[in-house]
Each structure stands twice: as structure tokens, then as C-alpha cells.
Amino acid sequence: MNRYTICIQLCQQCLVDCQNCLANMAGKQSMNECPVCCMECIDACLACIKSMSANSKFSKAYAAICAEICDWCAEQCGAHSHEHCQICTASCKACADECRKIAA
């Protein structure tokens, strides 16, 4: 297990949970940026996974931006009571916490 393994796993789970949230919110009105943040978070997690998998010298930078985007997504989805939004929120928070450890 390398130093990125846990972060990669949490990014993967966050990506899946954001995709699920996005699919469930498709076509529905949102009082905030929930669907938009899920799209951003999916892209950020994927980029972070790719950089860490390649042991890129930019992994810390990717992890920092991923944490910021995950925090935003957790805030947006956390405002909704839907189960998929709450799952997404928890996943985003866990991913952000681990990404911050990598970025430090």
C-alpha cells in the first residue's frame, strides 16, 4: 500500500456517490448548486485519482483543489434531505479530509 491508497479509495467512493447524487437530481429543481457541484466533484476526484496513481509531482496540488471542491459539494448536498444527497455529503467530507492530509 502506497501513501496515496486510502485517498484514492475515498476519491473513488466520492466519485461514485457524486455520480449517484447527480443521476438522482437529474431533471429536478435544486435550491442551490447541488447538481453542478457533483459534476465538479466527479472531475476533481478523477483528476486526483489519476495524479496519485501516476505518483505525479502535482498530487499535492490536485489533492488540495479536490478537498476544496469536495467541501463545497458537501455543503451544497448537505442542505438537502434526500438520502442520496446525505450519502454524497458524507463521502465528500471523508474525501476532503483525506485529500487535506495529502496536500499538507
Located regions from the model:
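Amphipathic alpha-helical hairpins
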Residues: M1-A104
